[in-house]
């Protein structure tokens, strides 16, 4: 799989970008702040419908523009697919597949399969559980695009049930049973949708765990073994069915209802879960050194890459300024993996950040002042 063409309109610092890409290695070179990371971000957005840098879509639209458009042409085993994504503030985003509108942008998920390495990856180890949940959900969706719908349904249920919990506390003291009966209904919705999401995550971690262990040994041979485990808010067993999770969620919500009503929040469900990262007998978060944390973060990404490869065609590798963050051993390990990828797209502040033996096409990025303000450009 590779991206043959990338077109941007009013995306971040790019008023317009029109790039012909090719298999192999391509390096976008330019000083920090010149917009090279925005190219990688656009490709990641096309693959996941999300940014690796911000939680909302609004910052992706260039200042003063009404909308941003990301267009890609992806080649997979000789077949071309064109994806157009239109991002608009305050309105639902639109998508086209092969120039035809689709009902939901989620319908283009799976066209571009990518794995992104970025400086922000350190948050996978040192950050909040939400970072690790997002990692799991993005990877699960890349493997099975239907998971995006499961996640959207679950998020909708959480919003509705949280609003109901906030209003139910007062109704309870007034003796109004109708609100509590409605809460029972939403308990069922949360259990049904939450169980599907938890089962998808658990299945993913089951297949991911051995790849993480192998990747960590590649990056840090002779060190403590790395291990991962899906830790749920209901202390469920590993590798169980959606039916088990559904029953366990219903039981946990029954037991914790008083606490939920008192606090007005959902205390049970996959939005409270975590991906447990361990080095030897210690948790990585709080105990891993800076180097160990980087090795664990890279292991998660390398494992994702290997898992996607076994599922089908090679995913596109996106390396956002990561070589500058790594020591020599980790740079060699990452370069070794990248050597076998069908397409690798890399950003670097200076060419010296790239392995010296890489045969890579270089595209120089610069900034220019014009009628659109200060915008990113490709040096001709």
From Swiss-Prot:
Instruction: Tell me the PROSITE patterns matching this sequence.
Output: RECF_1, RECF_2
Q: What does the record give under GO molecular function? A: ATP binding; single-stranded DNA binding
Q: A GO term (biological process) for this protein? A: double-strand break repair
Record CDD domains: ABC_RecF
Q: Which family does it belong to?
A: Belongs to the RecF family.
Note the PANTHER family from the entry.
DNA REPLICATION AND REPAIR PROTEIN RECF (PTHR32182:SF0)
- The name this protein goes by in its record: DNA replication and repair protein RecF
At the highest ranks, the source species' classification is: Bacteria, Bacillati, Actinomycetota, Actinomycetes, Mycobacteriales
């Amino acid at each position: 799989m590779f991206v043959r063409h990338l077109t941007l309109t009013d995306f971040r610092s790019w008023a317009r970008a029109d790039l012909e890409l090719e298999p192999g290695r391509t390096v976008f070179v330019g000083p920090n702040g010149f917009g090279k990371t925005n190219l990688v971000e656009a490709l990641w957005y096309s693959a996941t419908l999300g940014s690796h840098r911000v939680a909302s879509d609004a910052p992706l639209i260039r200042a003063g523009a009404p909308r941003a458009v990301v267009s890609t042409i992806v080649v997979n085993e000789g077949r071309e697919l064109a994806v157009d994504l239109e991002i608009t503030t305050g309105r639902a985003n639109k998508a086209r597949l092969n120039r035809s509108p689709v009902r939901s942008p989620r319908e283009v998920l799976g066209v571009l399969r990518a794995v992104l390495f970025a400086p922000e990856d350190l948050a996978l180890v040192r950050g909040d559980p939400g970072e690790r949940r997002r990692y799991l959900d993005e990877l699960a969706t890349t493997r099975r695009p239907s998971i995006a719908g499961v996640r959207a349904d679950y998020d909708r249920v959480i919003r509705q049930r949280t609003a109901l919990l906030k209003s139910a506390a007062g109704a309870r003291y007034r003796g109004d049973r109708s609100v509590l009966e409605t809460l029972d209904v939403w308990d069922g919705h949360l259990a049904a949708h939450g169980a599907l999401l938890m089962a998808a995550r658990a299945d993913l971690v089951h297949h991911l765990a051995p790849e993480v262990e192998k990747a960590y040994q590649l990056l840090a041979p002779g060190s403590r073994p790395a291990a991962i485990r899906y830790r749920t808010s209901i202390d469920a067993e590993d590798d169980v069915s959606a039916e088990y999770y559904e029953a366990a969620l219903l039981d946990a919500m029954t037991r914790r209802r008083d606490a939920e009503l008192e606090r007005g929040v959902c205390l049970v469900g996959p939005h409270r879960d975590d991906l447990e990262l361990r080095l030897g007998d210690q948790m990585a978060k709080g105990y891993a050194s800076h180097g160990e944390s980087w090795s664990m973060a890279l292991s998660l990404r390398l494992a994702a890459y290997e898992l996607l490869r076994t599922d089908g065609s090679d995913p596109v590798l996106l390396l956002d300024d990561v070589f500058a963050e790594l020591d020599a051993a980790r740079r060699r390990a990452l370069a070794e993996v990248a050597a076998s990828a069908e397409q690798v797209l890399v950003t670097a502040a200076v060419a010296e950040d790239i392995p010296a033996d890489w045969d890579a096409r270089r595209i120089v990025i610069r900034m220019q002042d014009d009628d659109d303000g200060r915008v990113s450009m490709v040096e001709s």
